[in-house]
Amino acid sequence: MEENRRNPSAGMEVPVAGGGNVVKWIEISVPSPSVSSSSIGANSSEDNECVQLPLSEDYASSSVIGEPSISFVWRINKTSPNALELLQLSAKSGFPITGLRFVFAQTLSPFAFVYADEGGDSGRLVYFLYSLTPSGVVYVLKLSNTLAYKSGSVFPLDHLIHLDVRPYLNESRVTSVAASPGFIFLGRSDGCVSCFQPIVYFQKSSGFHQELRDDTGFGRLGTVVAAVQDLFISEVHGRNYLCVLHADGALRVWDILTYSRVLCQSIAAKNLEGVMCVRLWLGKADYDSGIIPLAVLYRKSMNDSMDVITVYGLHFSSAEGIALSLDSGLQNIPLEEGELRDVRFTSDKIWTLKANELTSYMLCQKSSTMEAQSYTLQEDYISEQLFLSSRSSSHDLLLTTHSLFSSAKDQIMGFISSIFLRRLLCPGIFHNVALRLTLLDHNKNWTDSEFQSLSLDELTSEILLLVEHEVTAETSISVFHWWKNFCTSYLHHWCSNNEPRTLLVQSDVIGLVRNNSVSLFFRLENAEHSLGGSSSEHSNLTSLDLGVSHSDHEILAEVLRCTSKISKQWGGAPYAMYYESITGRPIISSDEIVPRLVNILESGYSTTIGQRTWSDLGADRAWEKELEAHKNLRTFSIDMLLSLSALCQRAGSWEKVFTIMEHYLQYLVPKKSMQKNDGEALSDICSSILVQATSQFVKVMFESAFDIFLLISYLLNIAGQVNMSQQDICKLRLELLPMIQDIVSEWLIILFFVTTPAESTSMEDFSLKLSSLQIDSSIDKRSWNAMLGKCGFSLAFILLFSDRSCIVDGRFNLRYLPSSQIITSLVQNFISWIRYSKTGDDSSSLLRRSTELSLRLIRNGQSDAVERILVVVEASLRGEKTFGCSQDTSGDWCLLQHLRGCCLLDQVQRGASGILRERKIIDAIRCFFRASSGEGSWKALHSLSKEAGFSPATTGPSILDGSTSSAAWKLHYYEWAMQIFERYNISEGACQFAYAALEQVDDAYNFIEMTEEFDPTKAATYTRGRLWANVFKFTLDLNLLNDAYCAIISNPDEEIKRICLRRFIIVLFECGKTKILSDGHLPFIGLTEKITQELFWKAGRSDIMMKPNPYKLLYAYEMRRHNWRMAASYMYQFSARLRSEGACKDYKHMSLVLQERLNGLSAAMNALALVHPGYAWIDPVPEETTRYPVKKARRAEEEQLRSNDQPKGEKSCIDIEKLQNEFVFTTAEYMLSLKNFGWTYSGLEKPPSDLVDLLVQANLYDMAFTVVLKFWRGSALKRELEKIFENMAIKCCPAKGTLWSSPNLMLTSNDEEVTHSPDRSPADQGSKLAGDWEILEVYLKRYIDIHARLPVSVASTLLQADSCIELPLWLIQMFKDGQKEKALGMAGQEASPASLFQLYVDYGRLTEATNLLLEYMESFASSKPAEVLKRKKVSGVWFPYTTVERLWWELEKTMNSGRMVEQCHKLKEQLHHALLNHLKLLKVDSNDAVSSATG
């Protein structure tokens, strides 16, 4: 077996999209065959399965279709063997957010195939999907539009083909399947291949099935063909050939067009028993060499020896037809441990995918040595980043962190969590599903949609709360263990949900299809190998093109071996700690982190580490750890001293070493790309690939530069031990150290851009910030704004999407997925654009370019990230020799300070609190003062006025180029800063800039000459007055009353001074600090009357409902002075304003306003009651108030002058009676508002007609009677009482169609249709009506003495509303009680039996009328002996005979109409009989009366 030479990692895996992308699957049910479905179900059992393909846990594959190419990826998951998932991937779009999941009724075999064809006349591509069931049913799905399907739908039958292949298999088993457009090939256990054309079958055409076999007839009986092991289809000159691998090692090639065999050759392993051919793969035909690469997997079944892939060359020639020949095996590829997942060919390589490794081998037709290149899978990258690998372990991080911090375990715990969180949520490491499952292990339950909706801040808070809850030991070692376990669990879930399944090949692009993601691979350049490799790789540095000799390359290799030793000593801890210290929480100064790390490297870990971990590790274990650390330190120190001494001896001097190192440092500087970027814009998917690849590349460069940084710092610490001269030390300290610091800062900033997730921003709040900072927001970012705040969306995406064509030139063809070369070029262009902009101009310094990129981020609300970037840039500038010069001339440093101040202010505005808020405010103030102090600062800020948040003032001295006053510039800038702090409610900062602006006023106006139009003295006075007014406002906001008063008396503008004084007094009253006015603390002289004036001014211009209320304060003030009338006047004005403003303002609780009005009127009446009756009056509410020179007062005056032109009536004085009347109206309005009835008192002296009706409607009967009795007399009073009781009676009537009954009260007509009220049930309505009857009874008895006819009005109203209603007994009794002596008939008062009888007749209540008449006639006839004498007097008896006659005619009329004939006939007979008896009795009584009179 030939030798294979394996090199270290040749490339990296790049995810196509961030881990936050989760595909939403659209489920589509695929119907089963309609014919003999029961038999298919029966034959689908294991015993009757005719398709027996090799089993696998999960099946996945892919194909590239069309031009431009579209990749289709499909998968059959072991958890859902009856579902096939299809994903479409295109270089012109983003990562697909939806995919198709076809759910079949049967289990699927591990096979599927997709191809495209033109869809007839439409010209659109139509996709066909092949699938196969173990029972032998082929499904062909026609997909016309992959975006048109809806979840839960059923696949249309007219686009579905079922083909049952069992009748054509001759009872053999299917052992292999392959497909090409229009064909499906089934390799059988009898050695034959069945070829089917499902489309032809669907068209009912013949010839849809063919068999590929060696011969026919009797000759075949003597030939035994082994079972088909594998099938593969290859295309040569437009013709498809089927390669068939048999179990005995025979290889047969068939021409699909002619169904003829063109090659038959054995490739079985010779002289080796038990070795069988398992799989077959072919590459694309190479027409230059006439060879098709062919690979066969050999496996020995008897023992556990490794599998081998042998690569053959299948030669073809097309002189006369196509002739094929197979050469002997050229190359052997041994497969070590790990399951082989896939094998693919590219133009010059063969790729093998195993569960934990991707390897490529160059195809060499002449050499027997195959160079193997291994590519780093994402699992290895994630484990290294999470400190779970041997190169980067959490133990190194633990020891280094304990040694780095001198104390404060809280700092250590927070620092540790911050490092792990940053790594965990970094794009390329973060995976949505894996993290959700990890948190599920910790009892954090979220659904997929809920978890996807979490922002970065919310996710961070949840994890930190989990740490706080679960880490109970409260020690740093416990936090380390928790994070190690958490990351281990996360890595496990990541690997379980992202197992490699198959390779995706598109031209020379190699992709990897995982369970839940897709990724590409790009090769590392030779330089990157040398930078990021081990010490053995540093021997080949000629590819770096440093411009040095071969011997110098060897010296450089020794230097890099020294950096490798330092890196090995540390592990991955220093990179993470340095990055977190610079970009994270400011726990350690950026100037201290590297010296501390070097001290640890030189003297070892802190001796207190054993004490810090005593309780966790125990004394013995801690001591062992300390001894081990000391031993490793001694070994490392000796090895480094020997290596550095040998390095110096080899070079001849340290100067030579430093010169070579300087060349190397020049190479580490980010390269400029001078290509003209005029290509098309990057798509979303290419942008994602670019950002992921850039992050991995920049990480290598950053770590390489940081290794040199540590080496140089280490050399400075041990300079005496390696015989370094003072000149060498100076060169190292003053030249190389600043240079490497700049390089590290540049790579760190780029790394920060590509790995830091963008923070979420509320667009509503952000628009306000944009308008306040005057930052341009014209960029259309609606398409990607939703990604802000997600873990997979870094700051680099914002930079890319703001200018998508910034890094693309004409060399790139972005119609396809980017190849490794294109990815590398894009990465280089992107880095160059970030560092040097589009032009790559040398004048684009780090400071200038950082501010340009910061502006792009500020436009998108990334103030936190910008602030950290500017901190890094500022720290880098502190180490430059030209720092002072750049600060004084270019203005870039001033712009940096200005932007950082804006970011700090934004952080304060967004919720910083406590000490952190105070620190950020102080830093922001310091930044703005620094920004104004540099030379040329006004030019830099003035040019970016619309974007950087600075807008030049429109008043005061102007700033013109060539005649610029430093004081004028600072005055403008300080005023702007004052306004910004004021806008953010940061009074302490605004006050400082107001004081600073005051210091510049005199100098700013000194250089301006006086003209007729402009007086600089007056302008300066006005400016000082305005600034002192601002100082007054800010000190008042800060509750610095003494300083506020000093600002008042210092103000030179008398008008502004008076306004401030007014404000000062008002604030004192509002804050409850009025004692300062009278305790002599402040020298107020003659302000007794001004207090009243100012408070009254405040009362007239403030919200009437404010608390404390100025009117009430005035009332109390005048009451204490015994000025009763003024006190009453203030309270009446208070009530009047409430009345006038309450109607036009939408108060939330109008009842509170009315209550305040009642209190005001009551207080006014009480005050006037203390005055002599002859003087108990107040003036009307004044229409004019004292005029003050303010805008509001001037507007009020203008409105007042306009209203004066209209005629006005004279207003009389207001006495107690008028107050009482208004009190009654206001009480009515208040009570109506409590019942949600709208009525407003408009100042009338008499109540309107609708007021009483509203009160009755609202059940406010007492108030209604109060109004009536207050404002009406005589007959008008009786009319209003009747109206009230009529309305009350109507409310007692049940609604039409409501079934209701109450004993002894009333009965409704039962011949109406019964319908329930929509707002209450019959029982509730009945209860309410019963209450209405009781209320009516109470009030009727109360007011019947005032108006005796009220019962008649009530009864008439009830009968008019419902003629069938039964009057309540108590109401009938009121009519009967009106007749005190029944012997006298039905006569009586207004509410008499006769009036009740008349009502019965009027409303058709014939039965009740007859019964009532009969009752009184019987009573008349059965008089007691004592009453007979009274009855026999003249005119002693009266009955309403006219009404009786009407009753008689009504009965006859009813009978004639045919209604109630029997009942009316019976009533008529009773009436007739009673009348006869009554008349007889009357005749006898009359005769007796006549006899008595004549006798």
Curated annotation (Swiss-Prot):
GO-annotated biological processes: defense response; developmental process; poly(A)+ mRNA export from nucleus; protein transport; regulation of timing of transition from vegetative to reproductive phase; response to auxin; response to cold
Taxonomic superkingdom: Eukaryota
Subcellular location: Nucleus membrane; Nucleus, Nuclear pore complex
Disruption outcome: Pleiotropic phenotype with diverse growth defects and early flowering. Enhanced ethylene response and sensitivity to cold stress. Reduced EDS1 expression and enhanced susceptibility to virulent Pseudomonas bacteria and oomycete pathogens. Accumulation of nuclear poly(A)+ RNA and high-molecular weight SUMO conjugates.
Tissue specificity statement from the Swiss-Prot or TrEMBL entry: Expressed in roots, stems, anthers, siliques and vascular tissues of cotyledons, leaves and hypocotyls.
A Pfam match: NUP160_helical_2
Keywords: Membrane, mRNA transport, Nuclear pore complex, Nucleus, Plant defense, Protein transport, Stress response, Translocation, Transport
Record PANTHER family: NUCLEAR PORE COMPLEX PROTEIN NUP160
Function per UniProt: Contributes to the transfer of mature mRNA from the nucleus to the cytosol. Required for both R gene-mediated and basal disease resistance. RNA export seems to play a critical role in stress responses and regulation of plant growth and development. Required for proper expression of factors associated with auxin signaling.
Subunit structure of this chain's protein: Part of the nuclear pore complex (NPC). The NPC has an eight-fold symmetrical structure comprising a central transport channel and two rings, the cytoplasmic and nuclear rings, to which eight filaments are attached. The cytoplasmic filaments have loose ends, while the nuclear filaments are joined in a distal ring, forming a nuclear basket. NPCs are highly dynamic in configuration and composition, and can be devided in 3 subcomplexes, the NUP62 subcomplex, the NUP107-160 subcomplex and the NUP93 subcomplex, containing approximately 30 different nucleoporin proteins.
Protein name: Nuclear pore complex protein NUP160
Origin species: Arabidopsis thaliana
Lineage: Eukaryota, Viridiplantae, Streptophyta, Embryophyta, Tracheophyta
